[in-house]
Design a protein with these regions (language model features):
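N-terminal pre-catalytic segment of deacetylase/amide-hydrolase enzymes
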Residues: 59-131, 293-301, 311-314, 318
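Metal-dependent polysaccharide deacetylase catalytic core of the NodB/CE4 family, i.e.
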Residues: 71, 76-86, 129-131, 151-260, ...
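Hydrophobic core
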Residues: 50, 54-58
Length: 318
């Protein structure tokens, strides 16, 4: 038979019960500690390891499960598309058409960075075989040769712009296939198609000289000076894009693929939700927003079929 409670009030009874439970739990811990101390050293170490595994294994299983559910995302990096000259950073129009036809025949769907970010941050579904086609620098030949092919194949691209070049060629227009860049009017025509997403490639940091390598911090340059320079450059293009197109980029493509730890800190502080690098490989998208930074890309060069480049990248990714 249970003994009658001798507490003067129900509240006192509750406090007494909680205290008894706390004392009981403490005694259990002390007993377990005593058992562990009584064990020989090797067994004592093993007991600690096993205790840790009870905590870590569920976390590892969760991480492994998330990785298993990761979505493979190839991002192809293009630059110029023109009929006469070709090389590492320039392919011919028939090569791009071959890429678009092959992708359509093999079940790929082109997506843009808004789709990628929405999947990672909000869980918005992606198509079964997503792929990003990114075009850097804002060349006029992209307007001439790429846009018609996008319309023909209903494909979408990410178009990363250099602000100063667009300003210059808006003021002094040129139809040179070899060196001209798009004007603001041409960019707006591309955006109006619904097939082009514009992103930030810097206003005027696309240079690789003794003075600076892309948007990298120089040796000996103070963090404050570098932060001010980078923010001012990128914000200028953000402001111009908002003014001339009504768009605000959320992705930054590193000029020449150069970056540092402070670069990413500044970019995140400015609200950029993703970055495109020149590191080679296939990306694996999870629901962790960290996977959106320094996204890998596969450079599409003349004479190297996209199908072969993708096969090699998938094989390397395992």
């Amino acid at each position: 038979m249970r003994a009658a409670c001798r507490c003067e009030t129900p509240r006192a009874c509750m406090i007494f019960a909680r205290s008894a439970h706390t004392i009981s739990e403490r005694m259990k811990r002390e007993e377990m500690d005593a058992v562990r101390r009584a064990l020989p050293v090797p067994q004592r170490v093993m007991a600690v390891v096993l205790s840790a595994l009870f905590v870590l294994c569920p976390l590892a299983a969760y991480a492994a499960g998330e990785e298993a559910d990761a979505v493979p995302l190839p991002i192809i990096m293009y630059h110029e598309v023109k009929p006469d000259k070709s090389g590492k950073d320039a392919i011919q129009p028939w090569e791009l058409e071959s890429d678009l036809r092959w992708l359509a025949e093999n079940g790929y769907t082109t997506v843009v960075m808004a789709d990628v970010i929405a999947y990672v941050r909000d869980g918005t579904p992606l198509p079964e075989k997503p792929i990003v086609l990114s075009f850097d620098d804002g060349y006029y030949n992209n307007y001439v040769y790429v846009l018609p092919l996008l319309r023909q194949y209903a494909a979408r691209i990410v178009f990363s712009l250099l602000g100063r070049n667009t300003d210059d060629f808006t003021e002094w227009p040129s139809e040179s296939i070899d060196y001209a860049h798009v004007t603001w009017a041409q960019l707006n025509e591309m955006l109006a198609s619904g097939l082009v997403e514009v992103q930030n490639h810097s206003y005027d940091l696309h240079a690789y000289t003794s003075e600076r390598h892309g948007c990298m911090q120089n040796r000996g340059e103070s963090d404050a000076a570098y932060t001010e320079l980078l923010r001012a450059d990128l914000q200028r293009l953000q402001d111009e894009l908002a003014e001339y197109t009504g768009r605000t980029p959320d992705t930054f493509a590193y000029p020449y693929g150069k970056y540092g730890d402070l670069t990413d800190t500044v970019l995140r502080g400015m609200g950029f939700q993703a970055t495109l690098s020149c590191d080679w490989g296939i990306n694996r998208l999870t629901r962790d927003s960290a996977c959106l930074y320094r996204l890998r890309r596969i450079c599409r060069s003349h004479g190297q079929p996209l199908s072969a480049a993708l096969e090699r990248a998938y094989r390397a990714a395992g």
